[in-house]
Amino acid sequence: MSLKNLTHALFTERFGYAPTLTIQAPGRVNLIGEHTDYNDGFVLPCAIDYQTVIACAKRDDRQIRVIAADYEGQQDQFSLDSPIVSHPDQRWSDYVRGVIKHLQQRNADFGGADLVISGNVPQGAGLSSSASLEVAVGQAMQALYALPLDGVALALNGQEAENQFVGCNCGIMDQLISALGEKDHALLIDCRTLETRAVSVPEDIAVVIINSNVKRGLVDSEYNTRREQCEEAARFFGVKALRDVSPDLFFPIQHELDPIVAKRARHVISENDRTLAAADALAAGDMKLMGKLMAESHVSMRDDFEITVPPIDRLVEIVKSVIGDRGGVRMTGGGFGGCIVALMPLALVEPVRAAVAREYPLQTNGLKETFYVCKASEGAGTC
């Protein structure tokens, strides 16, 4: 059963009437531009064809009722006229509550709603299931009440909800690509200005995501350490963020920095350049150059930012051995486990799947991957 049909059926069963609107917001994968977002840099994600779907309708009072189909049909209910606080034991509810609370702070002119939510964005894989949920809830309220909020505002609203209400530190990339994604395109995002440029993905190229199924330990503490090291490097150069440090400025005096801090800065500064070059390569259909840039990105994450782990490196090597210079592959996401992303001709998807299934468990003491074949998809809207 499709997510739309599932949410409609559950809505009618639990609320006793039919929904008036169905909204979707996608997950995402970042093709290149890792740990550049909080350095005011550039990223190149695309929305994927895994999404959160919400069946919804207005209410004629000030109550929000919400059902999570994927959490055994759990229900939450709260009033728009009372302070919105965290749910005592349903963590999923806090994403909904946070989005609604921050929408109120932006524009209080909306009433109650009934919502039924379901999604197929893999959780815990670094594919932004939480951003997909936040954008979907915001889009649902915007559509029901014709709120004067564009995609950027809905993305910022979701980020604020996650940072301030849920309590998870995140950049703007995940929400922005979920809100603004375009079919068959990646989106070059300037994380300082929030300006975007659509970049076409060649039609014969598949976006493949492979989850290493390595449990991501240390990710929060190491993430915070990397941020602090980047901020230290920016202070050394007297700039707001590493975005403002060019390679010409950095390389002649990198030896004056603490060696570890210099490595972290070298990754960010070179990754920004790679991301801009990758947007041009992808738009031109130059998969050989795109593959080279993705390979350099992975090496930089491994050696300078030090956020890959051996099973991830093995996975990248296995995929690279099959696709050669006909595509690209690298780790994607925060690091210390999670997923790799690969761009490859459709004809190579099954050979890659077979090679990974054969080699990955042998090289990693029995780990088994999860394989997703995706298409660059459109951002949030009705479905």
From Swiss-Prot:
GO biological process entries: galactose metabolic process
List of residues binding substrate: 34-37, 223
Tree of life domain: Bacteria
Keywords, comma-separated and alphabetical: ATP-binding, Carbohydrate metabolism, Cytoplasm, Galactose metabolism, Kinase, Magnesium, Metal-binding, Nucleotide-binding, Transferase
EC number: 2.7.1.6
GO CC annotation terms, alphabetical: cytosol
Positions bound to Mg(2+): 130, 162
Database matches in InterPro entries: Galactokinase, Galactokinase_bac, Galactokinase_CS, GalKase_N, GHMP_kinase_C_dom, GHMP_kinase_C_sf, GHMP_kinase_N_dom, GHMP_knse_ATP-bd_CS
Protein name: Galactokinase
NCBIfam families per record: gal_kin, PRK05101.1
Principal cellular location given in the protein's record: cytoplasm
Annotated Pfam families: GalKase_gal_bdg (PF10509), GHMP_kinases_C (PF08544), GHMP_kinases_N (PF00288)
Similarity field: Belongs to the GHMP kinase family. GalK subfamily.
The protein's role, per its UniProt record: Catalyzes the transfer of the gamma-phosphate of ATP to D-galactose to form alpha-D-galactose-1-phosphate (Gal-1-P).
SUPFAM superfamilies, sorted: GHMP Kinase, C-terminal domain, Ribosomal protein S5 domain 2-like
GO function terms (MF aspect): ATP binding; galactokinase activity; magnesium ion binding
Catalytic activity: alpha-D-galactose + ATP = alpha-D-galactose 1-phosphate + ADP + H(+)
Site positions per UniProt: Transition state stabilizer: 28
Enzyme class: transferase
Species, as recorded: Serratia proteamaculans (strain 568)
Cellular location(s): Cytoplasm
Active site as annotated: 174 (proton acceptor)
Chain residues that bind ATP: 124-130
UniProt pathway annotation: Carbohydrate metabolism; galactose metabolism
